[in-house]
């Protein structure tokens, strides 16, 4: 029996929510281990649409325990809002089926304000974030001045922790000519919200260790994608956390032995939100056609996603940096009807062919994709639930992707619906 990690193998938005929801039927516990409420999922279940940003997808299934790990940055108001909306849709969410790491870092209003300031300034600091305070909160975490969930339970030490936090932020704000923040106001806000949050607080590493020893199946749910990893992604156009599979252990308080199988998610094409290099981007009618068919708009932000052809080089790189055992290929149906489909198999950089994506920002901007043209298919793949339902040419496309990225396809998704999934290899039984 393998504990399974699900990670994005592109720039996020690969359809992790649906796949995690589909796999969660076999899991006992679903764990979020990094990121914040900047990465959204849209799930369609029995015709009902659910939008998640911070909560694990396990909350959509009864009888499952969902956990937010210590690697996440946690916005109290966003959490309460999301819980409230899902409860209004009839879901039962309580401390009985949702636990939050007591040592999770909190996102405060000052983090959101700083994030927005950087994105709107003309100083060259904008990189296309969601302005939700994710990066500034992680900065405070590694700077050892963050407020954590457990701090709300100790009102004797909380004022001192707020003062320590503001010693940094007010110095920064003073230099930027901004109004200074009153620590008493932060204290009032946190004191007011504490009774609503603390019932969810848990020593997560201990809880998960106990459950593992009891033989419970764990499903780790990543946010964003490997190409947004702060170390291995398209730096500086990345998120502020490690998004690769190894972070599942760190972000949940478990050792690497807790990971048994890594499932990577990728679309049958490529999308990206925000700024940064995108070698196969199609800023043309093809890109617009893919975007319209795939409804490529951010779940949280509504921003249109940039669209392009499948990049086998980048996905192959993600397979290596994440230790991916199998891929779940999503949105194959969006390519239905194309006469031909392009797949990037390599790059040219300054006249030379290379087989990997360079780390340097300048080199990333100069790479040119080398394409292989593949014949398309006319028959629909939408709603297919077995290989027999797929056109022969679509199967050839899937097999060619396997060859190019050096990794087998374990799952194939053909619509947003939970059941429109073709299983090749069950990750929990691998």
Swiss-Prot record:
Names of required cofactors: Mg(2+)
UniProt-recorded Gene Ontology molecular function terms: adenylosuccinate synthase activity; GTP binding; magnesium ion binding
Residues that hold GTP according to the record: 12-18, 40-42, 305, 331-333, 413-415
Reactions the enzyme catalyzes: IMP + L-aspartate + GTP = N(6)-(1,2-dicarboxyethyl)-AMP + GDP + phosphate + 2 H(+)
UniProt KW Metal-binding keyword: yes
Residues at which Mg(2+) binds: 13, 40
Binding site for substrate: 299-305
Active site (catalytic residues): 13, 41
A single GO BP: 'de novo' AMP biosynthetic process
Root EC class: ligase
Keyword Nucleotide-binding attributed: yes
Binding site for IMP: 13-16, 38-41, 130, 144, 224, 239, 303
Region called Disordered, residue ranges: 277-297
Compartment(s) where it occurs, according to its Swiss-Prot or TrEMBL record: Cytoplasm
Amino acid composition bias (Basic and acidic residues), ranges on this chain: 285-296
Pathway the protein contributes to: Purine metabolism; AMP biosynthesis via de novo pathway; AMP from IMP: step 1/2
Subunit details: Homodimer.
NCBIfam families xrefs: PRK01117.1, purA
Family to which this protein belongs: Belongs to the adenylosuccinate synthetase family.
Protein name listed in UniProt: Adenylosuccinate synthetase
Native source species: Bradyrhizobium sp. (strain ORS 278)
Gene it is expressed from: purA
């Amino acid at each position: 029996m393998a504990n399974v990690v699900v990670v994005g193998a592109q720039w996020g938005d690969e359809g992790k929510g649906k796949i995690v929801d589909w796999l969660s039927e076999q899991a006992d516990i679903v764990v979020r281990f990094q990121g914040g409420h900047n990465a959204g999922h849209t799930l369609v279940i029995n015709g009902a649409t659910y939008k998640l940003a911070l909560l694990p997808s396990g909350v959509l299934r009864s009888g499952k325990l969902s956990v937010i790990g210590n690697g996440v940055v946690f916005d109290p108001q966003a959490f309460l809002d999301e819980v409230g909306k899902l409860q209004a849709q009839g879901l039962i969410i309580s401390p009985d089926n949702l636990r939050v790491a007591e040592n999770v870092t909190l996102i405060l209003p000052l983090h959101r304000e700083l994030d927005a300031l950087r994105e709107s300034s003309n100083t060259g600091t904008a990189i296309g974030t969601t302005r939700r305070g994710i990066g500034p909160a992680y900065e405070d975490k590694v700077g050892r001045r963050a407020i954590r969930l457990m701090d709300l339970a100790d009102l004797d030490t909380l004022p001192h922790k707020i003062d320590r936090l503001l010693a940094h932020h007010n110095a920064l704000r003073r230099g930027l000519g901004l109004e200074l923040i009153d620590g008493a106001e932060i204290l009032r806000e946190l004191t007011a919200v504490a009774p609503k949050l603390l019932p969810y607080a848990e020593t997560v590493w201990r809880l998960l260790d106990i459950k593992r020893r009891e033989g419970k199946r764990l499903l780790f749910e990543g946010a964003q994608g490997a190409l947004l990893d702060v170390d291995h992604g398209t730096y500086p156009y990345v998120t502020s956390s490690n998004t690769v599979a190894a972070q599942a252990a760190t972000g949940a308080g478990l050792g690497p032995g807790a990971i048994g199988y890594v499932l990577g998610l990728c679309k049958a094409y490529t999308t990206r939100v925000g700024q940064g290099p995108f070698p196969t981007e199609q800023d043309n009618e093809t890109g617009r056609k893919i975007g319209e068919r795939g409804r490529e708009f951010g779940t949280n932000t509504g921003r249109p996603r940039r669209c392009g052809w499948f990049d086998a080089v980048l996905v192959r790189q993600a397979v290596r940096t994440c230790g991916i055992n199998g891929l779940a290929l999503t949105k194959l149906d969006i390519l239905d009807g194309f006469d031909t489909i392009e797949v990037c198999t390599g790059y040219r950089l300054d006249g030379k062919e290379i087989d990997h994506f360079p780390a340097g920002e300048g080199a990333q901007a100069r790479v040119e994709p080398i394409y292989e043209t593949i014949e398309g298919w006319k028959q629909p793949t939408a709603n297919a639930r077995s290989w027999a339902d797929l056109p022969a040419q679509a199967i050839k496309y899937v097999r060619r992707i396997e060859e190019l990225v050096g990794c087998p396809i374990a799952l194939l998704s053909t619509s947003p619906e939970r059941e429109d999934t073709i299983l090749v290899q069950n990750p929990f039984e691998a």
